[in-house]
Design a protein with these regions (language model features):
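Glycine/charged-rich beta-loop-alpha catalytic/anionic-binding loops adjacent to active sites
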Residues: 18-28, 131, 235-245
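Glycine-rich phosphate/adenosyl-contacting loop at the front of the ribokinase-like
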Residues: 1-75, 97, 311-312
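Conserved N-terminal subdomain of the carbohydrate kinase-like
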Residues: 50-133, 302-312
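Conserved beta-alpha-beta core of the PfkB/ribokinase-like small-molecule kinase fold
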Residues: 128, 134-210, 226-228
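Short beta-strand scaffold segments in enzyme catalytic cores
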Residues: 42, 88-92, 227-230
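Short, conserved phosphate/pyrophosphate- and ester-handling motifs at nucleotide-, phospho-/glycolipid
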Residues: 44, 193, 253
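Conserved phosphate-binding/catalytic region of the ribokinase-like
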Residues: 1-5, 151-155, 203-312
């Protein structure tokens, strides 16, 4: 497939507390970046694909970091500097099995996206436009921007990929459902978890088949430790998850999407795409941070060929 990935959304600073327990007792913190769309862009770039990210950041040190990190990862970054602040998320483990994330993003630079921020030439030249259900929740103008980009992709004959990515801290299911359903109907490729599919469709039935009934030709249901199921051009697929030691589950879904889309851009078939997606998601959760664990091709080869925990 000619062209690369183009995506747009909000990337934030990420403060992650060390250890396990209440945030007030944390002994140290790591600072990085995170955002679903930029995670996918970085993931595609690390797997050898071309990726472009479009978004707003503040005129602050966190905005500087985001721009440097994206470009350092080989992502083509269209960064619009805004007078508002760069958003922030704070992540800590209350218990070994409970991860808690707080967002400080209302009114942030990233939420102030407008349709004019999206370069028409970037969309026209893309192989895939990838958007998520997070950005439409940020503001009215951000929602307009997502649908503007999707319509521009349609006009140019560019494949549209949507990750439903419902965030209950950003909007209610009542407000989200019709918007997410509208996005799904405009996509050729859709990713969703079982609960997200139910949010869009209501309960009952096979989620992949029902989402495909809205128009997409490729529907992938991400189901964590259970692996994934998919309906791709009418063919059913199921792939088991790989068993790994989970360090940080955040970012696994983005790694999965990046693996699938990177292989799709490279011309791989459905089975190969899903296998890469599963492996990328598994590799990502073995690292702390949102994007630090996104794998390279050699990383995936090592994971899939490993018979023990020693690299020789």
């Amino acid at each position: 497939m000619s062209g690369g990935l183009v995506t747009l959304g909000e990337t934030m600073g990420l403060v992650a507390a060390d250890g396990i327990g209440s945030l007030e007792f944390a002994r140290g913190f790591a600072f990085g970046i995170g955002g679903a769309e930029s995670n996918v862009a970085i993931g595609v770039a690390r797997l050898g694909g071309s990726a472009t990210w479009i978004g707003r950041v503040g005129r602050d040190a966190t905005g500087d970091l985001i721009e440097r990190r994206l470009r350092g990862e080989g992502v083509r970054a269209t960064v619009i500097r805004d007078s508002s602040f760069t958003g922030l998320m704070v992540k800590h483990r209350r218990t070994a099995g409970l991860l808690h994330v707080d967002y400080h993003r209302a009114g942030s630079a990233g939420s102030r996206l407008v349709p004019a921020d999206v370069p028409a030439a970037a969309v026209r030249s893309a192989g895939i436009l990838h958007v998520t259900g997070i950005t439409p929740a940020l503001s009215g103008t951000a929602r307009e921007t997502v649908f503007h980009a999707v319509e521009a992709a349609h006009a140019a004959g560019v494949t549209v990929s949507v990750d439903v990515n419902y965030r209950s801290k950003l909007w209610s299911s009542y407000d989200a459902a019709p918007v997410l359903r509208d996005l799904v109907t405009r996509a050729q490729v859709v990713f969703a978890g079982p609960d997200e599919a139910e949010l869009v469709l209501g309960p009952g039935g096979n989620p992949a088949e029902r989402l495909a009934g809205l128009g997409p030709s490729e529907v992938v249901i991400k189901d964590g430790a259970r692996g994934c199921t998919a309906l791709i051009e009418g063919e059913r697929h199921a792939v088991k998850a790989l068993e790994v030691t989970v360090v940080d589950p955040v970012g696994a879904g983005d790694a999965f999407v990046a693996g699938y889309l990177a292989d799709r851009l490279a011309g791989a078939g459905p089975a190969a795409r899903l296998g890469t997606a599963i492996a990328a998601g598994a590799f990502a959760v073995t690292f702390p941070g949102d994007c630090e664990g996104l794998p390279t091709r050699p990383d995936l080869e090592s994971l899939l060929s490993a018979t023990d925990n020693v690299s020789r």
